[in-house]
Curated annotation (Swiss-Prot):
Pathway linked to the protein: Porphyrin-containing compound metabolism; chlorophyll biosynthesis (light-independent)
Name this polypeptide is given: Light-independent protochlorophyllide reductase subunit B
Cofactor info, note text: Binds 1 [4Fe-4S] cluster per heterodimer. The cluster is bound at the heterodimer interface by residues from both subunits.
Annotated GO CC locations: chloroplast
Lineage: Eukaryota, Viridiplantae, Streptophyta, Embryophyta, Tracheophyta
GO biological process: light-independent chlorophyll biosynthetic process; photosynthesis
Role this protein plays: Component of the dark-operative protochlorophyllide reductase (DPOR) that uses Mg-ATP and reduced ferredoxin to reduce ring D of protochlorophyllide (Pchlide) to form chlorophyllide a (Chlide). This reaction is light-independent. The NB-protein (ChlN-ChlB) is the catalytic component of the complex.
Single annotated GO MF: oxidoreductase activity
Length: 48
């Protein structure tokens, strides 16, 4: 988060941190998806 803030990049969602099913609707609106661990979210990021 700090690195992205320092680069003046707005964070849309951090999943699963405090996320809900309702929040998931905004995920496709992102310009890009950052996946820090490919084992966990690569397929999801590719889908989005």
């Amino acid at each position: 988060r700090r690195l992205l803030r320092d680069l003046d990049i707005k964070i849309n969602q951090v999943i699963p941190e405090g996320g809900s099913v309702k929040d998931l609707k905004s995920l496709p609106k992102a310009w890009f998806t950052l996946v820090p661990y490919s084992e966990v979210g690569l397929m999801t990021a590719m889908y989005l």
